[in-house]
């Protein structure tokens, strides 16, 4: 008898394969960065195109022109509406206090139903002063920014997404000063991200609903003679007689897609402003002929990210500086782009 070879179908690393709790992705781990800056940004996926550029990464094609698929993520400025301070608790970080800005856009009420009432400029300054005292006393161990998106600037929708971003650096006082300067103001992507650096992309994937084990796990379709008795796109059996239960490792039908995923080390090729990219000294519109399918025209700032990005068009995409970059990494500078495809994607 020949050797039986049946590799494991699909990965158990992502189990249970269920729908994400929220379409807004969460970031649990932040990279260590000596620069005092907001560690990441957020935008909306527009679509894909391709470019030609001179390869500056270490390898066989260095110095040669290469073809690179890229994803365009529109990133209107984020608004800093608050500061969140953390203290050291028994089991980890605990929220010590928050300070919210007193003048917020009316659209924020669509997302946050519990905005404080009778909260004016004097109250804001008083709470900010109390937080500064806590920082000076050494009770605060970390300071982070509370931001919300502004999708109405790109005519996408009115309800914003709210999220939290860490601040780089080691000094808590420097972090607080950074947050104090920016609360109540907008932050653009070019202020916190650098062209050419590696990013981690966090998003929720496209939802595909309920799918069978063949598409969901990659199991083989039954032999054609075995299909005569009934069906072929199913597993041969659910497991042994004992233990008398179905193991969780058995590939079965169920939810596929709309999963929370992180993709590491995507290079930020370029950052554009107001829908335009500087190419060979000239400004060009990044929007292809006829617009991006199911999205439209790029009106604000955008990121050009190498490769694909999880999620559907118009979905919120979050990025952060790479948390585990490779040893051989490209220089943190914009590569020389020779061509950008703006042909119709229809």
Swiss-Prot record:
Keywords: Ribonucleoprotein, Ribosomal protein, RNA-binding, rRNA-binding
Keyword Cell membrane recorded: no
SS bond partners: none
Disordered, as annotated region: 324-346
PROSITE patterns documented for this protein: RIBOSOMAL_L3
Similarity field: Belongs to the universal ribosomal protein uL3 family.
PANTHER family hit by this protein: 60S RIBOSOMAL PROTEIN L3-RELATED, LARGE RIBOSOMAL SUBUNIT PROTEIN UL3
Subunit field text: Part of the 50S ribosomal subunit. Forms a cluster with proteins L14 and L24e.
Function statement: One of the primary rRNA binding proteins, it binds directly near the 3'-end of the 23S rRNA, where it nucleates assembly of the 50S subunit.
Protein name: Large ribosomal subunit protein uL3
Organism: Thermococcus gammatolerans (strain DSM 15229 / JCM 11827 / EJ3)
